[in-house]
Curated annotation (Swiss-Prot):
Membrane topology: Multi-pass membrane protein
Keyword Endoplasmic reticulum: no
Gene Ontology cellular-component annotations: Golgi apparatus; plasma membrane
Protein's name according to its UniProt entry: Pantothenate transporter liz1
Domain of life: Eukaryota
Keywords, alphabetical: Cell membrane, Membrane, Transmembrane, Transmembrane helix, Transport
Main location: membrane
Gene (name only): liz1
Family: Belongs to the major facilitator superfamily. Allantoate permease family.
Subcellular locations according to the entry: Cell membrane
Gene3D superfamilies: MFS general substrate transporter like domains (1.20.1250.20)
Signal peptide positions (record): none
Amino acid sequence: MALLNRLAKTFSPYYGLNKVEQKLLIKIDWFILSYCCVSYFINYLDRSSINNAYLSGMQEDLKMHGNELQDINVVFTCGYIIGQLPGSYALQRVPARLWFSVMNILWGLMTIFSFAVHSVRALMILRFFMAVAEASTFAGTHYILGAWYKESELCKRAGIFSASGLVGTMFAGYLQTAVHSSLNGKGGLSGWRWLFIIDGILTIPLSLYGLFLFPDVPETTKAPYFTEQEKELSFKRLPARPKKKPLTLKAIKDIVRSWRIYGLCILWIFSGETQAIAVNVLMGQWMKWSNKFSVAQINNYPTVITAVGVVSTLGASVISDKLAGNPRWPFGLFLCVITTVSATILLAWNVPDGAKFFAYFASGCTYAGQAVWFSWANDICRDNDQERGVVVFLMNMCQNIWHIWWAPIMYPNTDTPRFIKGLIGLLVVGGIVFVSSCIVSYMQIRDKRIKRSIQDAKDFDDVFTEHESLELKKIGKNDEESLNTTNAVKEISSPGLVITRQRISMPKETNAQD
């Protein structure tokens, strides 16, 4: 029984809550996570489908040659980058249920239209605008999660969301296999064209579901499934936030002057690159180069990396929320260790295949950083909703900008199978992630200390003012005694801040009688 209680305390997201809050949290989880996770799943299903379509007949049908697939993916990434800041601004002004649903419908329609393309140029144009519509999904979801969940609840939900995208990556290959075997040639369409039709159709019911049932944010929610008591509790249970204001030029200047935007963007830029072994398909390229493995093995074995990513993401999310004080920096050390071990084994190269498999599979653990770092960004910027929205989108945008030039330089296909340059870079990247996580942690602690000092000073000032008021009441209006007040210096000290208050009052005129 004690073991079951311990497991429940560790893994249950509702352990220790009263019935009212537990019921509220179950509703939030269902209506937010169900929509966001399915959306992200389809998002990654679509991203992976372009590569599967290429291998399943699209190359021949569109007469693709050279690096045209890479060019299509670069165009997609450019659209994704361009869509970040408009998406951030829109979610500050437009209800999330409207923005997400409209973007998903546009994205779904353009995915369906992809079945009709007959040139690479037409496909590039569609992929560009699909990426713009898709750009709000990832960072926008992290922004919404940060609006609904406490610091101790957030990372678990972010982990589930991140894992859903990884599952979409795994599922894409299986879906393409099923579609190609059952629909290829039906209606005069190739299997890859049917894949785009199916991917697009999946988004339409999801968009309608979000339009009517997604709850927006606690302060403005009109979701019919929340009672009035639950609506009030949904924002009262969270730390107090300043009233939401428009994103003005002054607000942008304040955000740019803060360390947060730079520290968190640098952290995610390099943390995203720790996923290089998986993202750049190094394992599949080695397996194909070695001529030891069948086509099925080359397609299926690398999915273990993604499976490891799912497990490590969920595990890191649970642990992060359960650690006392919810520290996030230890995961910088974790990513540094994983990248160092994997890169060192692969740089050595002349090791048994089993060691190579271990290095490739272990690299899947680097996916764990995504949920942890975006939860951390929400925690750090919780006191400024404008900054929080801008920072989570900029983190995602900056990482994509970095990756668009980093990957071709560090992991070109000509370096197959060893990728020595990229793996040396991976060692450096792991170290930068650890150092930057420590710096961000230090700055967060410093901010909390200053904020606590200011609050202590305010509390003291309130008490001091109340004491003065009581003293004046005691004196009374008709008190004929003179009030001689000498300099009264009140000094309080707290970590990082010293506040001194000096009160000086002139003596009243005294009677002339001796």
